[in-house]
C-alpha cells in the first residue's frame, strides 16, 4: 500500500475528517528487524495512511501498548489489563475511534473493552474514504458505534 500512495490518494472521494488513535498491533511491527515496515518506537505507517483518507491522528504513546488479544485464551485477567492500558490514552484524548489493521486488536477493542471507544479497521477507513457506505462495509455490526461526519 505504501508504494502506491499517489494512486490511493486519487481514489479518495470522501475525506473522513475523523480524529483517530492509531494502534498498529504487535504483529505489524515486530520483529522490526525482519518486517522492516516501520520502526517499533513511535511507528508512523498508520498515521501516514490515515492522513491519505483525510483523518487526523492523535500522536499517542511512543511505544504502542499490546491490546492483549493474543493472550485472551490463555490469561483473561492479563488480557483485560493490557486492553485497559491500551484504551486509556485514546479515551482520555477523546478521539473518534481507534484505528487498527489487526484482527486481534479489533476484537479486543470492539467486543471486550468496556470504555466505549469505537474502533475502525484500516480497510474500513479506506473504503469509507473511497466512497463506500457504512452499510456496505458493515459498520452496523460494530458493538461500539462510531459517529461519522456527514458526507
Regions of interest found by a model, annotated:
Residues 1-151:
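Iron-sulfur cluster-binding electron-transfer modules in prokaryotic oxidoreductases
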Amino acid at each position: 500500500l505504501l508504494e502506491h500512495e499517489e494512486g490511493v490518494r486519487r481514489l479518495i472521494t470522501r475525506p473522513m475528517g475523523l480524529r483517530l488513535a492509531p494502534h498498529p498491533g504487535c504483529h505489524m511491527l515486530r520483529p522490526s528487524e525482519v518486517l522492516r515496515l516501520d520502526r517499533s518506537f513511535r511507528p508512523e505507517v498508520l498515521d501516514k495512511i490515515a492522513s491519505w483518507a483525510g483523518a487526523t491522528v492523535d500522536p499517542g504513546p511512543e511505544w504502542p501498548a499490546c491490546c492483549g488479544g493474543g493472550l485472551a485464551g490463555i490469561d483473561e485477567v492479563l488480557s483485560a489489563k493490557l486492553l485497559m492500558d491500551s484504551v486509556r490514552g485514546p479515551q482520555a484524548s477523546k478521539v473518534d475511534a481507534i484505528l487498527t489493521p489487526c484482527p486481534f486488536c479489533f476484537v479486543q477493542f470492539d467486543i471486550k473493552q468496556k470504555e466505549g471507544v469505537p474502533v475502525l479497521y484500516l480497510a474500513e477507513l479506506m473504503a469509507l474514504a473511497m466512497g463506500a457506505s457504512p452499510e456496505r462495509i458493515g459498520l452496523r455490526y460494530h458493538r461500539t458505534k462510531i459517529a461519522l461526519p456527514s458526507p
